[in-house]
Amino acid sequence: MDFIVEKAAELGASELWPLVCARGLVHAPGVERIARWRRLALAAAKQSQSSSAMNVRAPLGFDDLIRSVPRTTLAVICTQGAEPLSRVIRRAHPRAILIAIGPEGDFDNAERAKTSDAGFVVAGLGPNRLRSETAALGAVSIAQGLLHDAEGSGEDAESE
């Protein structure tokens, strides 16, 4: 997770919400670990000359995630074999994006149903099965690139 925090901050993600999933391989981190992630995000922001540090939130469960997504945010759940994330973003023209990346075992059926009921859009990152770290950083890269393209065209954009 340290690697994801550091690299997502360097790529310009504005927030990271650690998600506790049914198939997650790791228990929810403690206060010390979250403080470490926040320090890593701050250091990465300085290193990448970002104007602001990524906000690392305390871990939250799936139901809390769904309740926390602002209505104006494009909420996406990534899964293998779905429509490409880049296409989903281009079609939606979002100002902000929340991208849920599953654990190594992927999201379970109940989690998928909850996100579907909450209006999350399903998107993929290509045909290969990716580790969570790779998926998270690939998704941030895609989203940031497309949001910055939108900014260049006069639209206001922010990534979560």
PLM segments and residue spans:
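RNA substrate-binding interface of SAM-dependent RNA methyltransferases
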Residues: 1-77
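Short, solvent-exposed amphipathic alpha-helical segments in soluble enzyme
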Residues: 7-11, 33-34, 90-95, 113-118, ...
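Glycine- and other small-residue-rich loops at beta-strand/loop junctions that grip anionic moieties
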Residues: 54, 104, 128, 132
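Active-site/ligand-binding-proximal alpha/beta "capping" segment
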Residues: 72-114, 120-125
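Structured adenosyl-cofactor binding patch, chiefly the S-adenosyl-L-methionine
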Residues: 109-160
